[in-house]
C-alpha cells in the first residue's frame, strides 16, 4: 500500500513590509495559473512586490517536489491571498528635537500550490494524462478568471 500525501503545499509570509493593495495587484494576476506560467508573469511584472512573491512561489514548488513525488510541471496556484495587518509605528527624528510618527503598512501573504497529477490514476497513459491535465487546468483557470 502506497502512502498518500497531500496534493497541496502552503507558503505563509507574515509581516511582509508592503501595503496589502500593492501585493494584491500582483497576487491577482497569478491566481489560478500554472507554476511555469506564474514564473514568467512574475519575472516581467514591474512592481516591487513581484520579486518576493516570485521567491515564495519557487520556495513552495521546491518544498512540493522534495516532500512528495510531485513534479513542478503539474503544479498550479489554487489559492493566493493577501491579508492586511496593523501598521508598524515608528518615529522619525525631525528638527529641534521633535519627531513625527510613521505608519509602515504590512501584510500577510498565503500561497497554495496544488499538484494536478494527484487527482489522476497511475494507470493512465502518459499522453492521456497530459491531455487530462491540460483540460483540468483550463477548466480551473476559467473559474479563477471570472473573479
Swiss-Prot record:
**Entries under Gene3D superfamilies matching the protein:** Ribosomal protein L22/L17
The record's keywords, sorted A to Z, are: Plastid, Ribonucleoprotein, Ribosomal protein, RNA-binding, rRNA-binding
| Lineage of origin | Eukaryota, Viridiplantae, Streptophyta, Embryophyta, Tracheophyta
Gene Ontology biological process terms, A to Z: translation
What PROSITE patterns does its record include? RIBOSOMAL_L22 (PS00464)
Gene Ontology MF term list: rRNA binding; structural constituent of ribosome
- The encoding gene is rpl22
InterPro entries from the xrefs?
Ribosomal_uL22, Ribosomal_uL22_bac/chlpt-type, Ribosomal_uL22_bac/org-type, Ribosomal_uL22_CS, Ribosomal_uL22_sf
Description of how the protein assembles with itself and partners: Part of the 50S ribosomal subunit.
Recorded hits in HAMAP family, A to Z, give: Ribosomal_uL22_B (MF_01331_B)
Question: What is the purpose of this protein?
Answer: This protein binds specifically to 23S rRNA. The globular domain of the protein is located near the polypeptide exit tunnel on the outside of the subunit, while an extended beta-hairpin is found that lines the wall of the exit tunnel in the center of the 70S ribosome.
Q: Which domain of life is it from?
A: Eukaryota
Q: What is this protein called?
A: Large ribosomal subunit protein uL22c
Q: Name one Pfam family in it.
A: Ribosomal_L22
Any one annotated GO CC term:
plastid
Similarity section: Belongs to the universal ribosomal protein uL22 family.
Question: Where does it reside?
Answer: Plastid
Amino acid at each position: 500500500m502506497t502512502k498518500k500525501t497531500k496534493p497541496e503545499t502552503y507558503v505563509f509570509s507574515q509581516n511582509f513590509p508592503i501595503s496589502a493593495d500593492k501585493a494584491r495587484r500582483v497576487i491577482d494576476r497569478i491566481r489560478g495559473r500554472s507554476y511555469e506560467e506564474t514564473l514568467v508573469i512574475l519575472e516581467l511584472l514591474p512592481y516591487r512586490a513581484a520579486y518576493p512573491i516570485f521567491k515564495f512561489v519557487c520556495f513552495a514548488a521546491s518544498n512540493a517536489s522534495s516532500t512528495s513525488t510531485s513534479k513542478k510541471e503539474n503544479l498550479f496556484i489554487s489559492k493566493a491571498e493577501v491579508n492586511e495587518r496593523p501598521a508598524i509605528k515608528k518615529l522619525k527624528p525631525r528638527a529641534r528635537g521633535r519627531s513625527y510618527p510613521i505608519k509602515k503598512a504590512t501584510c500577510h501573504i498565503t500561497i497554495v500550490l496544488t499538484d494536478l497529477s494527484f487527482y489522476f490514476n497511475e494507470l493512465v497513459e502518459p499522453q492521456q494524462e497530459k491531455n487530462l491535465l491540460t483540460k483540468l487546468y483550463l477548466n480551473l483557470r476559467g473559474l479563477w478568471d471570472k473573479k
